[in-house]
Amino acid sequence: MSNSQSIKIKKPRSNENFASGSYSSRRSQQIHRLSHSPMAEGFHKPKLNISPSESNLPNNVAENTTDTPVNYGSIRDENHNSRKGKDVTLNSDEAHSENVPSTSEDPDVVRRHLGGQAADDDNFSSLQLQGGDMHRQVYRWQQEVDQNKQIRRGRSRSFSAKVSDPNLHLRSVQDMKQAGGMRRDFLRNRASSISMSSNAHGNPNFLNRNFIEFLSVYGHFAGEELSEEDEDEDTDDFAMPRDVNPSLIHSTVPSEQEPLISRHGRYKLQTPGNASNGKAVLLLLKSFVGTGVLFLPKAFKLGGLVFSSATLLIVGVLSHICFLLLIQTRMKVPGSFGDIGGTLYGPHMRFAILASIVVSQIGFSSAYISFVASTLQACVKVISTTHREYHLAVFIFIQFLVFVPLSLVRKISKLSATALIADVFILLGILYLYFWDVITLATKGIADVAMFNKTDFSLFIGVAIFTYEGICLILPIQEQMAKPKNLPKLLTGVMAAISLLFISIGLLSYAAFGSKVKTVVILNMPESTFTVIIQFLYAIAILLSTPLQLFPAIAIIEQGIFTRSGKRNRKIKWRKNYLRVLIVILAILISWAGSSRLDLFVSMVGSVCCIPLIYMYPPMLHYKACANNWILRTLDIFMFTIGAFAMAFTTYMTFF
């Protein structure tokens, strides 16, 4: 059999039935489909010429061949409209090229039409099929596309350019002639008009509806694309490939198999941010206010009343400056936190930033686990009849049983209920803490306090930095804003407000309880039923917040290790599940090791994990991207020096 094969089609007899199921009829249908399957750029297109008079197809199908190309899920090529048919010549040597397509063909659609075992089976060979040598080039093309996609999936997909709405493209008469074309056009036009009218009113959406927007901030942690759409169970086979060229979206022609309202596909169009200034302020407040507030009273004891108040204010100012440096760098160099570092300094800087994010998030999660274990231990001791104090390891193990199933959640929006409950409980705990601080000071006065503690003051610096850590959520909030240029002034107001909140809670609680203040200040509350309820609810709030802290670390590690999706390969998916469980076990072990000295552990996390992200990386990025005068360069060098010195000093004092 020659590689270049010509197939001639006889003219049909008048009494021949098209649906007879004969070999020639089926062969004609296959040639008809192949001749109208859009070939990708970079391929030598086979000569496919079909004439209505010479084909073995009925008249209505032949007429449709020259006017309306049949779409099998691929994005239409403009050359389809100009295809005219005469003879059919298929050169199998021209069906393969060294260049892998990246524009028009949808590999998922091609995969559905391939026979044999699953495409993800590494032991599968198309030569084992009947006539495998004839269609081997098709399987080889599919294999090269998959390999090219695996290489591209090695890096996080954090491209932030905006793509225009594909529903706004003009539709031709031939598109309208397709079955369901007029209805499809009507639905698109109506959806477009509704969206335009809603945008014209300018009314903001409901305040952080179901906390989906806040969760999407974690889905784009530090600007990285961490979502796992390719592994969602609601992703169907009509999903657009992740590596499709966005410019070709406008030429998409729906086929008969395409649903009118497609499901949430794997390719997400970047839509402009629509968050108002007020919503951005609330997102910022949620990003900064958390568990660190409850560690501040004990930290004030470590540093002293005056020293701690002044240091907390200075740390807030320095953190604010570094946040602004990162925002300015992002405006100059678009991309995620890691992408900016990779663009300016190369892949090693990108790796360092992502590694710091992973270490910091695992450290936060471990601190949260220790906090929850300590709080639950105190609650159980109060409510039990024997007042028995169980070991912390028991409550840490209970959290392990909770975190394992939650860590297997790949769609972060499914954690919206836990985020809502956690924020409500945290707010109740802070209000209750203020209430008892004021009551205690009014009835008992100021307790025994120290203005400066020269022995343990260095530990306070790490706790203060831990409290202000939220830099990785700045960039995704900026993406969601309708007016990103307003973020610097909004951030200034938010930093002033949370600095006042942190200083007031630390100062009032330390003044109220003095040297008897505990590591978790809510444990200083008087033993009562309502107090136990508040303590328990706050512990549950932090327990439900821990999966959100682990999600970015898990996603970044997965994207660095696995280059293949687990949607169609159960083996890959279970390997990812094992990795997630191992990360949870690592966080559990770290929390168990640091649970005996929780204040020391929190200070260590702030010193080792948070300082590089806040005080070292942003000045370095700003220095290379935006420092165009000696003042800015001096500021960047000063901030980097402060961060490096603080990291070395606090780490040394913590361990030695």
UniProtKB/Swiss-Prot annotation:
Compositional bias per record (Polar residues), positions renumbered to this chain: 15-28, 50-71
Membrane topology qualifier: Multi-pass membrane protein
Positions of region (Disordered): 1-109
Modified residues (Phosphoserine): 37, 53, 172
A GO BP annotation: sporulation resulting in formation of a cellular spore
GO CC term (a single one): endoplasmic reticulum
Main subcellular location: endoplasmic reticulum
Keyword hit for Cell wall biogenesis/degradation: no
Biased composition (Basic and acidic residues): 75-97
Subcellular location: Endoplasmic reticulum membrane; Vacuole membrane
InterPro entries: AA_transpt_TM
Domain of life: Eukaryota
Molecular function in Gene Ontology: L-amino acid transmembrane transporter activity; L-arginine transmembrane transporter activity; L-histidine transmembrane transporter activity; L-lysine transmembrane transporter activity
UniProt keyword list: Amino-acid transport, Endoplasmic reticulum, Membrane, Phosphoprotein, Sporulation, Transmembrane, Transmembrane helix, Transport, Vacuole
Membrane-spanning intervals of the chain: 280-300, 307-327, 351-371, 389-409, 419-439, 457-477, 494-514, 537-557, 578-598, 601-621, 636-656
Chain's role: Involved in amino acid efflux from the vacuole to the cytoplasm. Capable of transporting large neutral amino acids including tyrosine, glutamine, asparagine, isoleucine and leucine. Required for spore formation.
Family of this protein: Belongs to the amino acid/polyamine transporter 2 family.
Protein name, as recorded: Vacuolar amino acid transporter 3
